[in-house]
A protein has these predicted regions:
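Short active-site-adjacent helix-start/loop capping segments
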Residues: 16-19, 82, 196
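Conserved S-adenosyl-L-methionine
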Residues: 1-41
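SAM-dependent nucleic-acid methyltransferase catalytic core
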Residues: 25-142, 146-157, 171
């Protein structure tokens, strides 16, 4: 919802980047037709293991550089909790789940592709500290890293990509300090507390720099205190 002339999307997972590039650059109708065709050919159904394993094998036995992002999207739709998981060889290794493609998801896909095509977006898969050539004082930076004190398929270090740990957390926080000193406005999504565990690194960093904290719905929920951290006066942008 941020009004801007250009969007820059950076994700360490280059497979996610390729998927978004596909949504932007390929014809939306052709994407939809591909999904419908593959569902019919392989008789995909939510919770049914055998057809799912066939398309997963098709994806994994294709050379990495030739793997179709649309097939990855199909795997995500029918995979467990719709997660994006890879092993160290970049083979997709998520088991079958209980979800699938339906009319509601089709509407969301079409709407998302249309919106993406209307925007001026550039896609990257760089380390977050290597973005300086794309950032200036007029840039607004939003960071949504893995949450240090929660466990996800993206931050256990076993999914074919770099895991998230205290070292990475410190690197990110130091980089945001660097942006702040340059006068660049940023927003960071994170979690202060989860199941009685606190992210003391983040708490100390916020207090040291005097950054603003916004809680989702103004309160903690389900033993999980999700927050947004900003380095500017929120009232200026309301």
């Amino acid at each position: 919802n941020y009004n801007c002339d250009q969007l820059i999307y950076n994700d360490c997972n280059f497979k996610v980047r390729e998927l978004l590039e596909t949504f932007k650059n390929e014809d939306t109708v052709e994407i939809y037709k591909y999904i419908e065709k593959m569902i019919k050919i392989y008789k995909l159904e939510h919770g049914v293991k055998e057809p799912y394993l066939k398309i997963r094998e098709l994806y994994n036995t294709t050379p990495i550089e030739n793997r179709d992002p649309k097939l990855l999207y199909l795997l995500v739709l029918y995979g467990f909790q719709q997660q994006i998981r890879f092993n160290s060889s970049y083979d997709y290794n998520n088991p079958v789940g209980q979800a699938g493609f339906n009319d509601k998801l089709a509407e969301k896909l079409i709407s998302y592709c249309r919106n993406l095509k209307e925007k001026n977006v550039s896609f990257y898969s760089r380390d977050f500290t290597d973005m300086d050539d794309l950032i200036n004082k007029n840039t607004f930076v939003y960071c949504d890293p893995p949450y240090l004190i929660t466990l996800g398929s993206y931050n256990d270090g076993k999914r074919g990509f770099n895991g998230w740990n205290e070292t990475e957390e410190i690197r990110l926080l130091k980089y945001l300090e660097k942006l702040n000193k340059k006068g660049v406005k940023f927003m960071l999504s994170n979690v202060l507390e989860h199941k009685n565990q606190k992210n003391n690194l983040l708490i100390d960093w916020i207090n040291k720099n005097g950054f603003k904290v916004i809680e989702y719905d103004g309160k903690a929920r389900k033993n999980r205190n999700e927050i947004i951290v900003v380095n500017y006066e929120v009232s200026d942008y309301e």
